[in-house]
Amino acid sequence: MSAKDPSRGLLVSPIKNGTVIDHITAGEALNVLRILGITGSTRECLSIATNVESKRMGKKDIVKIENRELRTEEVDRIALLAPQAKINIIRNYKVVEKKGVEIPEVIRGVVRCPNPGCITNTDEPVASTFEVLDKGLHCLYCDWLIKDDIANHII
């Protein structure tokens, strides 16, 4: 319970080991799970909180994944959806590492190009490569620009 507001306790229990993804853009928690390949049939024990009040963001989502630490490419995917997200690595109930996500300048093999004629969508063994711009994601093979709904293009 908080000393300032006794009506506010912990929304979900702490985890012993794993990852807490905090400050996810409100409404994006389920997309974060999807791009991490976490479904209802996977083995991870999850805690999800959506539209939680946040002084800094107004509203935010939080995801706790027990017994799993994220790989760099997974963190890069999260950065595309939630650029303000914080990744907390938990070991024995303690935060041992806390870092913000960084959107890379170039992403490879993370996003599928929506252009059906792009070489990355053929049988050629070519990984998609996008330059990250303020206005969206620019395919370096076919010059296609993804401006909206990036979550649906993440592999």
Curated annotation (Swiss-Prot):
Keyword Ubl conjugation set for record: no
Biological process according to GO: 'de novo' pyrimidine nucleobase biosynthetic process; pyrimidine nucleotide biosynthetic process
Cofactor dependence: Zn(2+)
Chain residues that bind Zn(2+): C113, C118, C139, C142
Keyword flag Zinc: yes
One Pfam family matching this protein: PyrI
One of the record's GO cellular component terms: aspartate carbamoyltransferase complex
Matching InterPro entries: Asp_carbamoyltransf_reg_N (IPR020545), Asp_carbamoylTrfase_reg (IPR002801), Asp_carbamoyltrfase_reg_C (IPR020542), Asp_carbatrfase_reg_C_sf (IPR036792), Asp_carbatrfase_reg_N_sf (IPR036793)
Keywords from the named record: Metal-binding, Pyrimidine biosynthesis, Zinc
GO molecular function, one term: metal ion binding
Annotated cofactor note: Binds 1 zinc ion per subunit.
Subunit text: Contains catalytic and regulatory chains.
NCBIfam families, per the entry: ATCase_reg
Function: Involved in allosteric regulation of aspartate carbamoyltransferase.
Family, as annotated: Belongs to the PyrI family.
Name of the protein this chain belongs to: Aspartate carbamoyltransferase regulatory chain
Lineage: Archaea, Methanobacteriati, Methanobacteriota, Stenosarchaea group, Methanomicrobia
Protein encoded by which gene: pyrI
